[in-house]
């Protein structure tokens, strides 16, 4: 039995955009989350006609697992509020088959490579049945509340 809260307790996401089902582990530099590619899972709205998850969702699964890592650490430091993070980009993001296959329980692994103030870089992998399905390096940014407000105000005025 996991001693972690649900992913939604660490992320600012709500259904249907909350794409993770379980937090498996979080440590100083790593996190692992699970989700099943199934019509009965949180991924159901995004599956193709064959029940597969399109490969481009790999980036969001990785980003949300990074968010779980960040949210868990914030809670450990007594910071109760969930904050928004941003993906700056991804390097060498590969989903070799183009899809995350139907019926597979995905294990999303993230490992902190570098963190400097509000920037971070993570090596990420998505696996199922001991097979690596997607890999990449995801770079993130943690904006301040003021920066988020400015960004949303600019978006609302266009």
Question: Locations of the language-model features?
Answer:
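Residues located in well-ordered beta-strands
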Residues: 19-22, 89, 94, 109-111, ...
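Compact, glycine-rich, soluble single-domain proteins
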Residues: 49-68, 84-88
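HotDog/MaoC-like acyl-thioester-processing domains
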Residues: 100-107, 111-158
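A generic structural motif
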Residues: 24-27, 94, 114-116, 142
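Catalytic strand-loop segment that frames the active site of acyl-thioester-processing enzymes
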Residues: 15-54
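Hydrophobic beta-strand-centered segment that forms part of the acyl-chain substrate-binding groove
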Residues: 68-107
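Short aromatic-glycine motifs in intrinsically disordered, low-complexity regions
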Residues: 2-14
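Beta-strand-rich interaction surfaces with strong enrichment in secreted/lumenal proteins
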Residues: 8, 50, 95-99
